[in-house]
């Protein structure tokens, strides 16, 4: 299981209520572009895309996937480069192994991954810290 329905609803609400939530990937767009240029690759999947900032910022077509965001919840096809920014620390502990396997299954060649190692400034609507596994 990638996400429980209860947690999916909490995340939907968090994304809806916080305009700044889900835009962290923009910080890394230049680094991702540099990596893609270095390996001559434009087949990219943004796994956990939130507001799909990479699709807006990068000069080539990006697959945007996020099970918490209805318009991005369709399962993607595997890509040569998978980008996963500010996602894993938000995964429910009991779902982490399945999410990691899912990420592996969608990654053909390379991955660009970030994981926060401190508590988030934001709280979930139920009061828990938004970073569940730090």
Question: Where are the predicted features?
Answer:
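Conserved N-terminal segment of class I S-adenosyl-L-methionine
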Residues: 1-79, 97-101, 106, 117, ...
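Hydrophobic adenine-recognition pocket in adenosine-nucleotide-binding enzymes
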Residues: 87-90
């Amino acid at each position: 299981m990638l996400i429980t329905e209860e947690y999916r609803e909490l995340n939907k609400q968090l994304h809806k209520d916080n305009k700044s939530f889900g835009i962290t990937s923009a910080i890394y767009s230049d680094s991702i572009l540099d990596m893609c240029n270095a390996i001559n690759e434009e087949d990219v999947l943004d796994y956990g895309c939130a507001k799909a900032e990479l699709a807006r910022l990068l000069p080539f077509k990006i697959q945007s996937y996020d099970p918490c965001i209805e318009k991005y919840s369709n399962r993607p096809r595997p890509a040569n480069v998978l980008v996963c920014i500010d996602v894993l620390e938000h995964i429910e502990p009991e779902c982490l192994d399945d999410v990691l396997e899912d990420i592996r299954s969608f990654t053909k060649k390379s991955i660009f991954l970030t994981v926060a190692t401190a508590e988030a400034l934001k709280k979930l609507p139920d009061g828990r810290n938004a970073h569940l596994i730090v």
